[in-house]
Amino acid sequence: MEDDCEELQVPVGTLTSIGFSISNNNDRDKMSVLEVEAPNQVTDSRLGLPNPDSVCRTCGSKDRKVCEGHFGVINFAYSIINPYFLKEVAALLNKICPGCKYIRKKQFQITEDQPERCRYCTLNTGYPLMKFRVTTKEVFRRSGIVVEVNEESLMKLKKRGVLTLPPDYWSFLPQDSNIDESCLKPTRRIITHAQVYALLLGIDQRLIKKDIPMFNSLGLTSFPVTPNGYRVTEIVHQFNGARLIFDERTRIYKKLVGFEGNTLELSSRVMECMQYSRLFSETVSSSKDSANPYQKKSDTPKLCGLRFMKDVLLGKRSDHTFRTVVVGDPSLKLNEIGIPESIAKRLQVSEHLNQCNKERLVTSFVPTLLDNKEMHVRRGDRLVAIQVNDLQTGDKIFRSLMDGDTVLMNRPPSIHQHSLIAMTVRILPTTSVVSLNPICCLPFRGDFDGDCLHGYVPQSIQAKVELDELVALDKQLINRQNGRNLLSLGQDSLTAAYLVNVEKNCYLNRAQMQQLQMYCPFQLPPPAIIKASPSSTEPQWTGMQLFGMLFPPGFDYTYPLNNVVVSNGELLSFSEGSAWLRDGEGNFIERLLKHDKGKVLDIIYSAQEMLSQWLLMRGLSVSLADLYLSSDLQSRKNLTEEISYGLREAEQVCNKQQLMVESWRDFLAVNGEDKEEDSVSDLARFCYERQKSATLSELAVSAFKDAYRDVQALAYRYGDQSNSFLIMSKAGSKGNIGKLVQHSMCIGLQNSAVSLSFGFPRELTCAAWNDPNSPLRGAKGKDSTTTESYVPYGVIENSFLTGLNPLESFVHSVTSRDSSFSGNADLPGTLSRRLMFFMRDIYAAYDGTVRNSFGNQLVQFTYETDGPVEDITGEALGSLSACALSEAAYSALDQPISLLETSPLLNLKNVLECGSKKGQREQTMSLYLSEYLSKKKHGFEYGSLEIKNHLEKLSFSEIVSTSMIIFSPSSNTKVPLSPWVCHFHISEKVLKRKQLSAESVVSSLNEQYKSRNRELKLDIVDLDIQNTNHCSSDDQAMKDDNVCITVTVVEASKHSVLELDAIRLVLIPFLLDSPVKGDQGIKKVNILWTDRPKAPKRNGNHLAGELYLKVTMYGDRGKRNCWTALLETCLPIMDMIDWGRSHPDNIRQCCSVYGIDAGRSIFVANLESAVSDTGKEILREHLLLVADSLSVTGEFVALNAKGWSKQRQVESTPAPFTQACFSSPSQCFLKAAKEGVRDDLQGSIDALAWGKVPGFGTGDQFEIIISPKVHGFTTPVDVYDLLSSTKTMRRTNSAPKSDKATVQPFGLLHSAFLKDIKVLDGKGIPMSLLRTIFTWKNIELLSQSLKRILHSYEINELLNERDEGLVKMVLQLHPNSVEKIGPGVKGIRVAKSKHGDSCCFEVVRIDGTFEDFSYHKCVLGATKIIAPKKMNFYKSKYLKNGTLESGGFSENP
């Protein structure tokens, strides 16, 4: 039995780093045990288990747990280029000249002063440039290198008349019989591996080492054969024994053995074998462009790439875990978890045996001993089977889970810190489910509709201590995301708390109060009513008194919003409202945490029990009568009529908003006197046009929601006070008023989140369902075959209570039943992984800074928190900030993503990915208005309109009413003009409304032609643009106050005439698209309102927000960025814009314009706004840390693997293993191996994967180093007294100090001085207090000690550690201490004074310089503090020639 329990010994060592490299031929020979010379040796028994012999012929093992397998090697007949280096070799060959092997530069013209170069380096010699490239971009098909003639150079030769290449153009390539050059193009050659070696032969080795660091692995003369265990896919058991089935790699290995083809074929087979490696199979694609053309889908490994990294290398498996469904149990305490007895018996807890727990542990093992007659314990490093009598102290016993044990509970996904809670076990007689108090659902973000909880049973003492001290529920009462309370009242408790305070007739007698007092932690107060009535002499208590029994004595709390006042634990006042009871800012639980944090859990648990019992006594149920809201038929009728009126009013508001759009203003002028019978058709037209435009739909939805709030308010007007739905809604415990309105009153607005091919009719009736002209039929108009896009929009007037007709049911299904976030359901998880990838290793260091464990890089100088810095030292602050934002992203999934509303989730994604360098089609700029506009009435409104009018592009086509081409030749002109003249008619009313003139239009067209004439690509000289009040072609049109603008083409010559089609198809579209006002690059300008916290603050503005303009521009403009172009456009209106607050919304562009500090501020403001839109509140320190982690290198990087890799590259802390855990492990490992990178495993994820402890948090390691110097303690010293007496002294200023100033006390000066200063606490002490502690005698002893030290050493001899420490401290009292210390003190020595034969102390600085000083000046500085009246006495005694001066003494040193 002991043999069965024997465990394998694991090698012990300290892992410091891992190195990556490409194996060379020597490495493969050393790790192989067999040279494969025949195809059948690929599955040889010497390559490990499993094999046909069932025994490993190398190590003799028969168990796969002992034998992990052995490698073999296949030697090739000739060397080939390692396929991994083909890309680097091609890049290196492109840098050098193939003829002279020098670094290739631009070809130049030979002159007398220039040295002679080879024909490939010289211009105009007929030898064009060439380019080397691999045969394909895919890594697994790079079997060779191709060289091609540069097409641009070849075209230049053809223009000079040289049609063919010189005969010796390819002479730099040695002849290779394996390549038939006759079938190749004359401008292209396939280079064999032998030819590559020949080209690399003459290149400078330094250049090769720079581009190919692992050059010794370039040649591939052998290939490794993996052990059998990595290639066996199936074991089939037959009558004659087991039959092994190997994977596709085994077949390819056999094809490599004894291969006799050319190098290109051999390289192709090597790449085919690499394709089937587990690590590289992540690039296998099911598409047509698969990396391996010979691949079969059935041969693709199932566990591949990133999944292999996560499941095999990063996945940690344990037998001490469980997962099951959770149910609610309010009888459990908040920190308890109910575990079924059947599950508890199967979970084991390790515990060391000692005298205190021996009896308890032996008793717990009685059932086991009755069944098995023996028990297993771990004694030392071995598992042994023993009897009870053989137990020894120190044995590790494995017992079943018991009451009082601690387990770690978690509900995936763990998106925030508090989803991991250590809870106390309580064994329950249940089956298959765990039980949880409903109040604890909030931190787990779960409920009881089938959610599962994961449990982890700690085994080590360290793990148990960490659970109790770090993640226990009583240690997580404050939510680290928003700084408020983590727990709050549950649904039933919250409803009861609201009712017990709101109900005016809530009175309780003595029996009821005594019954409820059993659940309250504090005493029963005196009754509020001594005698209720003559018939009832029993005293009465109010509901407020009942609820006040939950507050401890001395508790004071106010909540002005609900008029709540609590004084000394007594609830004095309260008005209708439940905000102070909910999980909001300033609630009573948050105040209880500040009053007495240790009692909060008990108070919340007592409140739940008491309030649930009171609600059970009172009763609360929901019936169909609650849905009717009204108590009688007439009230219900009135409610229905008001709902109908409210919906009509909301529709009118939408129509008015639609008429305010500029494109609909003509409708008011034309239809202002329409007949009444046409109004119905106009409303139908409004509805139809609204659904065809996303802008109009967005405007209508916003206006309808604003007007619809009045309809929702009818629920409170007509609903009874006893309505259970309204009670729960007011209490905030269940549902919302919107759902109640949909069920009881009307469903209301229904709009689709995506565009559809059909629309909704204005009235959702059965007649509209059957109408052939309804928008439901799709296309409308003459061309019924065209497909139009709609944004469906409709209003359902019925409710679920009254029922829906078929069309209303269809509309509701189309709009509401669609999965609004199905396309972005994985987005929060992606953001969470990326944020955690960036911030996982950021922690609070012990010096108060925030650092990254990679290279100990500084992220923040101080962490901006309200609490003391010591409380967060060692914490993983980056993970906390990442979790805070991740939770906000997950909460945004509940908000729909549609065309009509901005998605908070996508907005948050765009803010976090601001560092991406991907080209953006559009960029936005924020322009804030200048303060001087406030001096005018409505100055900001008029100013914003004027800026918009100046910037927004107004195309020529928008003001032109008629365009035509007239044939009117002119023969009397000096310049040749085209006979085709373009006429454009413009109404003067339009010009006036657009604030334009005919002259300004002509000027704008001329400017646009001069700046954009290259876009025309027409053979013309110029355009003659004029304006006139009469038109030769249509005089009747000019009578309506129209202006005619003519455009005539100036021909290059009289013989060249521009064709009519060129004018019609090219010139006229160009002119109509030209802007006559605004900028060509500006797409649109929106006037928006922003709340004050989201906008840069303006001095002296008391408003809650302000107007600003959002300018949308088309991408980047080459050398000129969008911001520069906008500045030039705004030159005429510079004074109207506050340029100190205006900025580009693109963070990278903002940083390039204003610097990284301004970009950081804008990023934090945008991030705060995006988080606020999700409905979550996050502490500002989390937002600042996210901004600093992304911009720690001086610029914002992309939130992806490339951005993280760039940070590691800038900080010179490569971490390929950590990056491989995030994405593309094969590419990460391959790149690191080709560069020979060493990974120091500084991160947390790589440290844990390799069995190390992360270097922060509770895993922060330190070592005690013994100094080789002798400290000189002759008698035993109490280490605690010694450590408490050692103080750190700050550098003092040489300026005189008053009695109110503070200084730092002396440190360990001398043994005689130590007894007097040990009582100091190391903090700043007033000088007046120092004088009461130290005396002149202490100063004399200090002077004598320094004199003794000075004369105890030889000249130029360094002081020992103790004396050096004393002199360093005293040096701080020197009046010129800063100048004496300089860059820093390396040591103190005794030197000969420069001013005589006496000795003095000399500072040895860290830069190698020396500076002497007099210790008398230092003692005199101490005298000035302790005994200023003794200064003249000390000077006369020790400083013979010293005289007191302002700021110091005249003694030389």
UniProtKB/Swiss-Prot annotation:
GO biological process: DNA-templated transcription; regulatory ncRNA-mediated gene silencing; siRNA processing; siRNA-mediated long-distance post-transcriptional gene silencing
Positions annotated to bind Zn(2+) 1: C56, C59, C67, H70
Its EC number(s): 2.7.7.6
Role of this protein: DNA-dependent RNA polymerase catalyzes the transcription of DNA into RNA using the four ribonucleoside triphosphates as substrates. Largest and catalytic component of RNA polymerase IV which mediates 24-nt short-interfering RNAs (siRNA) accumulation. Implicated in siRNA-directed heterochromatin formation through the action of DCL3 and AGO4, and subsequent DNA methylation-dependent silencing of targeted sequences. Essential component of a self-reinforcing loop coupling de novo DNA methylation to siRNA production.
InterPro entries attached to this UniProt entry: DNA-dir_RpoC_beta_prime (IPR045867), NRPD1_C (IPR040402), NRPD1_N (IPR040403), RNA_pol_asu (IPR000722), RNA_pol_N (IPR006592), RNA_pol_Rpb1_3 (IPR007066), RNA_pol_Rpb1_3_sf (IPR042102), RNA_pol_Rpb1_4 (IPR007083)
Descriptive protein name: DNA-directed RNA polymerase IV subunit 1
Lineage, top ranks: Eukaryota, Viridiplantae, Streptophyta, Embryophyta, Tracheophyta
Keywords, sorted A to Z: DNA-directed RNA polymerase, Magnesium, Metal-binding, Nucleotidyltransferase, Nucleus, Transcription, Transcription regulation, Transferase, Zinc
Record-stated family: Belongs to the RNA polymerase beta' chain family.
Organism (species): Arabidopsis thaliana
